[in-house]
């Protein structure tokens, strides 16, 4: 029997449109999947129960998909730097394929695994899959990575987009002798969520697995994508795709998503619909902008992109941070969003911007505390997107506007005018008139235990601006012009 090829799954929990997997299948029919439950990730302080639950659901379906194709998914638990080379050696594998990671830990881990495989005389083949364009494809004319989205988008959107690759079929499983040889290294079955040390019953924006992700993409592109632009900022409406967890874990291929949107664009009969589809495609470009940024500037994972913000005098008042995490700020739109996050593991993007601005510029708390809290709860928690979003809100990252400050009441009035979203997540305030919910000016009797505002927005934004201007003057570092 020919030497098998192993494919190591990480953020690509599917068989369809998987570049590394398709390349491995082109080399051999005896293609065996593997996934390693890495304690470095699962036991991280940033791990969210919702994310582990989604991962487990994806792995369950991936096991079934491999069986249907004639092969299997091997499960390991422990340090992949040791287990994967050991498994490959036991099987006398010809090669181990995987798709590249952009995160600092993943890149270091992959380098260690590749080095160990090379020492053992086994090929390590790494390909790009989670991006439409790899980080070295989208560079400025001088060969540097972009730090501003506009020029990045202009270059990115002009590049021809790759098409989905074929789904591997007619695979060959390991022999009984091979399975016996590696049995001591393997998990006999996928651990339950409880066995992994987590509990989750908050559901998901889209059910785990490739089948549900493909169905949701098709449903979205058949209908809602045509109204995406006018609907996407209203949290009470189902105006977004809900595909962020599937894209995070690779339950769906990015090329599949682009092709489906492009097909909808070609079939659209109005300029408004075509514009909406283009806006959704721009969100895919934002995703790649942040991933490219983290790849080129891995220090973003630990701190601000702009050095001025290293010295910003965050107040970091613990009582205010606790109130924010517990949806007790007294600002209904903020508290509704925070409750949605903690109960469902997901938050509407408009609300994300509101609560992030509130934490950093009303409460004057270091954005990194908000970033970590989100990662501890988000089902779609992605280091690059989460970090990029928080640095955007704090004005410490790329494309900064330091004095961009969201007024919670103005945001609620514009995007939740009937307070439908607020009442959905704060049912204890359903008796309050929408006008008062939006403004936050609720009478003491009407509050019925709901807190009064913990800070005065107008006063705090003045204090934040003063702190920023004082620091800027002291350091005299060029920054982007603030909003007028």
From Swiss-Prot:
EC number of this enzyme: 4.1.99.3
Keyword annotations of the record: Chromophore, DNA damage, DNA repair, DNA-binding, FAD, Flavoprotein, Lyase, Nucleotide-binding
Keyword Lyase: yes
Residue stretches making up the Photolyase/cryptochrome alpha/beta domain: 3-132
Cofactor(s) the protein requires to work: FAD; coenzyme F420-(gamma-Glu)n
Residues reported in the UniProt entry to bind FAD: 228, 240-247, 346-352, 380-382, 386
Listed GO MF terms: deoxyribodipyrimidine photo-lyase activity; DNA binding; FAD binding
Gene3D superfamilies registered for this protein in UniProt: 1.25.40.80, DNA Cyclobutane Dipyrimidine Photolyase, subunit A, domain 3 (1.10.579.10), HUPs (3.40.50.620)
Catalytic activity entry: cyclobutadipyrimidine (in DNA) = 2 pyrimidine residues (in DNA)
One Pfam family here: FAD_binding_7
InterPro entries xref list: Crypto/Photolyase_FAD-like_sf (IPR036134), Crypto/Photolyase_N_sf (IPR036155), Cryptochr/Photolyase_FAD-bd (IPR005101), Cryptochrome/DNA_photolyase_1 (IPR002081), DNA_photolyase_1_CS_C (IPR018394), DNA_photolyase_N (IPR006050), Photolyase_8HDF (IPR019947), Rossmann-like_a/b/a_fold (IPR014729)
Binding site for coenzyme F420-(gamma-Glu)n: 36-38, 51, 101-109, 248
Cofactor note: Binds 1 FAD per subunit.
Swiss-Prot/TrEMBL site (Electron transfer via tryptophanyl radical) positions: 314, 367, 390
Chain residues that bind DNA: 232, 411, 472
Region Interaction with DNA, residue ranges: 283-290, 349-350
Cystine residue pairs: none
GO process terms (BP): DNA repair; response to light stimulus
Family, as annotated: Belongs to the DNA photolyase class-1 family.
PANTHER family documented for this protein: CRYPTOCHROME, CRYPTOCHROME CIRCADIAN CLOCK 5 ISOFORM X1
Subunit composition and interactions: Monomer.
Role noted for this protein: Involved in repair of UV radiation-induced DNA damage. Catalyzes the light-dependent monomerization (300-600 nm) of cyclobutyl pyrimidine dimers (in cis-syn configuration), which are formed between adjacent bases on the same DNA strand upon exposure to ultraviolet radiation.
Name of protein: Deoxyribodipyrimidine photo-lyase
